[in-house]
Structure formats: C-alpha cells, structure tokens
C-alpha cells in the first residue's frame, strides 16, 4: 500500500489550487534544480506546450524526481508524454511509445510500454532536439496513435498531483 503524504492527502480532500497557485508550485519545484537544468527544463516545457496544445499537465514532485505528464484527460494512465527530471537530466518519455516506428533510432528503452529521448544529460543539453524533424515526427505519430486523442480546442490545465514530503536532492552531487 502506498503511503500518502500530508500534501497528497490535502490535495485529495481540499479544493485544488488555482492555475496561478499550481504555476507557482511548479516554479518552486523547478527552482530546486541547478540553474542550467532549470532553464533548459523551462524551455523544454514551453516547447512541449506548443507541441501538445490543450494537454492536461499532471505534476508529480516525487521522492526521486520531478515528472510532468501530458494527457488528454485527468487520468494518468491516458498520458501520452512526460518530462522526467532526475538530478542533472531532462528526459522526454513517450508513455505509449513501444510500438512507434523509429527508423532513425532516436528512442531509447526496451520495455513493453515506454520509450524515451534524453534531452539534457550531465551538462550536455540538446536544445534543438525538439526541433528535429525526426523527433517531431515521433511526437506527431505518438499523438495520432494515442489511446485517447487530444481533444480539439481544449485549454491547457496544470494539476499538481503529488508532492512527496521526503525527497532526494534535485542538484547533482559532486
């Protein structure tokens, strides 16, 4: 059984934060990272918001890392993408990506469901990866093949789903 933190319990039993409050919380989560990782993550988040218009953004500030999921609904199981941020890294996960055609071999991973592309790793950002035609094609194919399609004309919504009371440091040690 998963232990519920006081923040999770409060989130389930009270009024959810406004969009402005959720944005402030997300900003504080990102600020825990090294400045260059934070800046890269903010730029990546901005690009993803343009590529996945109208997504429900579900934020999990977990023990190990920060995760921002992009979904057509508020159901985590229907999310299509996520940005995952362990210390010193930013990774784009294709949450329904195992069957995506990838002739350029950009996707990493061998699991039955998820594939990923590392965007930032230990001080080596790839700021142009989300502009790469092969990666844009993968994103478009993932959107078109999603179990639940993104609703046309939907407005973006930011939801803080989980905040772990105990967390590992967000800055790389060393």
What are these regions (language model features)?
Residues 1-174:
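Charge-dense, helix-prone N-terminal extensions
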